[in-house]
Amino acid sequence: GPLGKLLKNKVENSVRHVFNFNNFRELEGPTIMPDKVWKASGHLGTFSDRIITCSKCNAVFRADKIVEEKFDVSADGFSDSKLLDFIREKKINCPSCSGRFIDKLERQSLMMKTKVAGQDASLRPETATVTYLPFIRMYQYFRKKLPFGVFQIGKAYRNEISPRQSVLRGREFTQAEGQLFIDPKEKDNWEKFDSVKEEKLPLWDYTLQDAGK
């Protein structure tokens, strides 16, 4: 409603303020692109979720979320076999009817498909890819000098299996992303690098992710 829209505008403007303060420039990219773009980016073949189906009511769920909702583990990094074994060993049943799951995982693409002039196309699942595409034009705008930063605030679309977490896992949502283009040889000499080089980010390495921690 109107109040929610006002709140959303305030959030977006706060994001804009941070980017503008750091001399990033805003751009707006297309929301629909031909599939050759998404094939090149890797989204078309790999941007998917693992799903599992109830043998009784045929309801479909994200397999990793079924595990995470019942146990304090991060299942996103589980291999397919480990995920199935976990569901089997813990006797996790369908949340809708308590039926047993079919002992098989399948992949469902998160890409929203469409047709443009008879050609296969997809709605963008994030804003980064269409920000990279006009690099040459941006490079010319910034007088062919690096580094420069750009950002985009706009809609993204994902074919979510069962979006049950309100705005956090919607099929249509607004996303903000920024990109900093810098010469790799100059990355440690960037004028603002000294102000952030001591910052520590709480990132999980691949061993912890594989362990589901």
Show which residues each predicted segment covers:
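TRNA-recognition modules of translation machinery and tRNA-sensing kinases, especially anticodon-binding
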Residues: 1-213
